[in-house]
Regions:
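Aromatic- and glycine-rich beta-strand/loop motifs that create alpha-glucan
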Residues: 1-18
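Hydrophobic alpha-helical transmembrane segments of multi-pass membrane transport/permease proteins
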Residues: 16-36, 51-60, 164-168
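Secretory targeting signals
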Residues: 30-34, 40, 45-51, 55, ...
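Terminal transmembrane helical anchor/hairpin motif
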Residues: 36-42, 46, 161, 165-227, ...
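Transmembrane helix boundary and interhelical loop/hinge segments in multi-pass membrane proteins
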Residues: 44-48, 63-81, 95
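Hydrophobic/aromatic residues in alpha-helical transmembrane segments
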Residues: 60-64, 112, 143-144, 223-224
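Alpha-helix N-cap/helix-start motif at helix boundaries, enriched for small hydrophobics
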Residues: 88-92
Length: 234
């Protein structure tokens, strides 16, 4: 798994993808930081974190679009699938590579917290709790998009489908309120990512929210392993 992880991580920095994702994330987080903290003279990062929820849904598909689709396009997937490394290790190696880049993106919020501390007293407990929520959210979305990437050999298709899925997640909270059928509304609310993420932005650390994101992550990684397993024996 270590070799897969190192290969994946170096691949991000040997291409433009890693730099583009970092640049876009830093740009929007910096923009929101200026608008909601400096411009409004506020010590709270809550609105910054809240708005980054929507940005994450669209940059992660770009980050993960090449994980398996590029392997299929270049016909290197068969060598990977027949290697002595287990399919689970392959999937985890690629997942951790993408998550490391995402973690570097999220680390900028620690810098923002330090900057605020020069002028006011930031609520570090809320900042760290929300940062944990953003990392858990990223884990789930990365796992989902890696699964999407395993289904196609086109990076563009993987990115577009991933963004479409992100758009559905972004609008699910609003859509669930418009559904007249109560049991459907209940289900939509229970799978609404924003509901679970919002609790973190209030500094509320709930085991239910943590389990939700970890479960989604594990489920999509499991699905990805099953896709690769079927391809190995086909």
């Amino acid at each position: 798994m270590g070799a897969i992880y190192k290969r994946e991580l170096s691949g991000y920095f040997n291409s433009a993808i890693g730099y583009v994702v970092l640049a876009v994330y830093y740009f929007f987080s910096g923009l929101f930081f200026y608008l909601y903290c400096f411009y409004r003279d506020s010590a709270s990062l809550g609105y910054v974190f809240a708005n980054m929820f929507y940005i994450v849904m669209f940059i992660i598909p770009v980050l993960t679009m090449k994980t398996f689709s590029e392997e299929r396009r270049q016909k290197t997937d068969q060598a990977l699938l027949t290697s002595p490394v287990s399919l689970t290790e392959i999937v985890l190696g690629k997942f951790l590579g993408a998550f490391t880049i995402y973690g570097l993106c999220c680390a900028i919020f620690l810098v923002y917290g330090v900057v605020i501390s020069f002028f006011a007293q930031p609520q570090w407990s809320v900042v760290l709790c929300t940062l944990l929520g953003m990392l858990l959210l990223g884990m789930a979305i990365i796992a989902m998009n890696i699964f999407i990437s395993s289904l196609t050999e086109s990076m563009v298709v993987a990115a577009v489908i991933g963004m479409a899925a992100g758009l559905v997640i972004d609008t699910m909270s609003s859509f669930s309120k418009l559904v007249p059928i109560q049991w459907v509304q209940f289900i939509l609310e229970k799978i609404d990512f924003l509901n679970y993420y919002t609790n973190f932005t209030y500094g509320i650390l709930s085991i239910v929210d943590v389990i939700f994101f970890l479960s989604v992550t594990g489920l999509f990684l499991f699905f990805t392993v099953r896709v690769l397993e079927r391809r190995r024996w086909s």
